């Protein structure tokens, strides 16, 4: 799977301090190599990789290319050591007149410089690829950090949450009135001037409503009229019971 070079404005690479240090050092080293002609040499020898080509690599391609660059660096270092070893040998050979002095430049020196420039070219490519790898890994971390909350959200049973909230009634005080409102349908509410009346209404009426009853009440075009009717009926019944209790109390006392 190819990892696209996504840009995250709030956390683009390099993001943290260590990434910035690594990024700056890598860029400074590569720029120094360019100044001494490594870039031109690598283009002539075909070692150079265009930045656009490196940017098109996914993580797997980049790791494979990094492995190749490592092998080429080790190989050129070995030949560089061989060249460095040959030069003193030829030098002492010329002193002892076993080898003509001109052979020093024809055999040892070109071998040293060629492998030195090859090594530096591959090191520059290695640094560029490592920076690209760090950028890809950073983008993958950001992508995963975005995907994890999404997976959590997808696993939530919203229907159950909604059903639960529809059966919850909350209360608040507005000026001198007491208000009870539905936790899901916030525009479904009842207003009372006495707190005890409100609490009794919740206990005796609202707590006994089913989810379907609440849906029907909230979505009914004449909801306001039904709400007022429901509240008036409750108050009327309460007053009737209160009068009956008073009447019973008087009747008992008079007896």
Curated annotation (Swiss-Prot):
Keywords: Glycoprotein, Membrane, Transmembrane, Transmembrane helix. The chain crosses the membrane at residues 72-92, 104-124. The keyword Lipid metabolism does not apply. It is found in: Membrane. It is a multi-pass membrane protein. GO terms for cellular component: membrane. Its main location: membrane. Glycans are attached at residues 16, 58. This is Uncharacterized protein R342. It comes from Acanthamoeba polyphaga mimivirus (APMV).
């Amino acid at each position: 799977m190819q990892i696209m070079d996504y840009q995250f404005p709030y956390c683009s690479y390099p993001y943290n301090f260590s990434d910035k240090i690594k990024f700056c050092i890598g860029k400074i080293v590569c720029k120094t190599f360019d100044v001494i002609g490594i870039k031109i040499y690598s283009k002539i020898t075909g070692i150079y990789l265009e930045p656009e080509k490196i940017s098109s690599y996914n993580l797997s391609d980049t790791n494979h290319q990094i492995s190749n660059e490592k092998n080429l660096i080790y190989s050129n270092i070995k030949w560089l050591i061989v060249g460095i070893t040959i030069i003193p040998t030829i030098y002492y050979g010329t002193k002892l007149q076993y080898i003509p002095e001109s052979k020093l430049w024809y055999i040892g020196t070109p071998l040293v410089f060629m492998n030195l420039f090859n090594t530096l070219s591959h090191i520059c490519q290695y640094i560029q690829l490592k920076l690209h790898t760090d950028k890809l890994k950073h983008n993958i971390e950001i992508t995963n950090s975005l995907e994890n909350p999404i997976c959590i959200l997808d696993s939530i049973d919203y229907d159950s949450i909604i059903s639960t909230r529809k059966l919850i009634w909350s209360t608040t005080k507005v000026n001198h009135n007491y208000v009870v409102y539905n936790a899901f349908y916030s525009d479904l509410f009842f207003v009372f001037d006495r707190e005890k009346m409100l609490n009794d209404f919740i206990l005796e009426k609202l707590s006994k409503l089913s989810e379907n009853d609440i849906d029907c009440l909230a979505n009914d075009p004449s909801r306001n009229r039904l709400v007022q009717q429901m509240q008036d009926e409750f108050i009327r019944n309460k007053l009737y019971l209160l009068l009956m209790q008073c009447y019973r109390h008087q009747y008992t006392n008079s007896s």
